[in-house]
Amino acid sequence: MTSSKNPTNDNSYFDAVLVGAGIMSSTLALLISEVLPDIKFLIIEKLKAPGSESTGAFNNAGTGHAANCELNYTPLDEKGNLKIDKALSINRSFERSMSLWASLYESGKIDIKKFLKFIPHISFVSGQDNISFLKKRFQKMTDNPEFIDMEFSTSFDEISSWAPLITKDRNPSTQIAATRIGRGTDINFEALTKEYLSLVSLNKNVEIRYKTELVDLKKIDKKQWELEISSEGRKTSIRTGYVFLGAGGKTINYLQKSKIPEAKSYGGFPVSGKWLICEKKDLTEKHNSKVYGKADIGSPPMSVPHLDTRWIDNKKLLLYGPFAGFTTKFLKQSSYFDLFSSIKKNNIFSMLDVGFKNNDLINYLISQSLKNHNSRVDNLKNMMPSANPSDWYLKNAGQRVQIIKKTEGGGSLKFGTEIVNSSDGSLSALLGASPGASTAVSIMVEVLEKSVLLLNDKHNLQKKINDLIYPELSDSENKSIYIKDIKKRNNSIFGFHP
């Protein structure tokens, strides 16, 4: 059945068009299909398969960001006070993602074994100042039900039992500390995307076109957009009432083409990445955790090193990094002109201002780009002293485009994700990077709620969303019980026993 919004059954008209077939678009597609099954919508993807760019298993950290171990989510303010608001927000958002997966798994719609593994998340530091910071973080975070199961240790032997490769060949007299949460996860977002789209494709009102690229878009009247798309050299036009731009780093270029006023203040700063990877079974079997360190003072947030157990294509691997670099491409499979084509009269000064203000980032990217294999392994040895260069090889990770936003003082470089909505709710775009994928459900619920798709029956549709996943947590006296109930329910469905 086609939507009533398209009474002419025009094959070139869709109620919604989603650009990109990564974790963001597929999450939105899943929500639309579950909550608004009669909506006729189209997903277009430039590549020949879903989840092949930023969502690709090797192209993102796959950490299952829950702020369990990422120390950059709990910074110190100017007075030395620990700020955990961001960590709490990320953790709650990730639990909503877990709730959706639990609901879909319980109803037999997806197979969690294809994308989710439970694995401890560990924060590891050395040196007295860092140990004091980690202890302060532990004490403040465990006051909250989200992190009540966190453990803290300064015992060399106990930390060795948690992560033996971290302590092997390390001087036992070294001052070290670690926190551990057993209920961490490794998420293969590429596999999850494919699960979502396999489910969505069962809806006869949904069409997915691969090897199809957005060329241009423009608003043709108050209720419609016209999109020019290209598939294997053949250009066609389609019309829609709603557009979602979820094309990774390339989104900034598409957003600018839309010419909505809200797009004028944005630019993008591309950053590339590389992993050190180990496949040796005698090492992969000894490390069963994700271990995050602490960035050096003055280093950008993206410089936080981590040694991760990952399962990719049914194979257990160790990944260390990511090592950053600079490129003018916004996607791995796109053009070196991406950055230059994104420079406009309304953002050039903010982009130049960001360049002048962020010498530390520029220097960091240059130094990272100049590293050779041995120097990268030397970096790894700070976390894994026994690392041997011959056990590791280098692999390109994904591109990320950090947000540049115009401010009164010039420009600001933002680390995170941001939704840009047109004033009439007919277009949404997702910009930025981490912790994106892990919080995709909360982000896409927000996108859907602000879109024209929910205008006619917002209350009932929001109820449908909350029946599918737990609602956003609000401050209440029963916060502790609420969070415990959600985790208990999700653990039971997933078969996780703390």
UniProtKB/Swiss-Prot annotation:
SUPFAM superfamilies listed in its UniProt record: FAD/NAD(P)-binding domain (SSF51905)
Reactions performed catalytically: (S)-malate + a quinone = a quinol + oxaloacetate
Organism lineage: Bacteria, Bacillati, Cyanobacteriota, Cyanophyceae, Synechococcales
Top EC category: oxidoreductase
Entry GO MF terms: 2-hydroxyglutarate dehydrogenase activity; L-malate dehydrogenase (quinone) activity
Protein family per UniProt: Belongs to the MQO family.
Keywords: FAD, Flavoprotein, Oxidoreductase, Tricarboxylic acid cycle
InterPro entries associated with the record: FAD/NAD-bd_sf, MQO
Protein's pathway: Carbohydrate metabolism; tricarboxylic acid cycle; oxaloacetate from (S)-malate (quinone route): step 1/1
GO biological process, alphabetically ordered: tricarboxylic acid cycle
EC number(s) reported in the record: 1.1.5.4
Cofactor: FAD
Pfam families the UniProt entry points to: Mqo
Protein name as annotated: Probable malate:quinone oxidoreductase
Presence of keyword Chloroplast: no
Gene: mqo
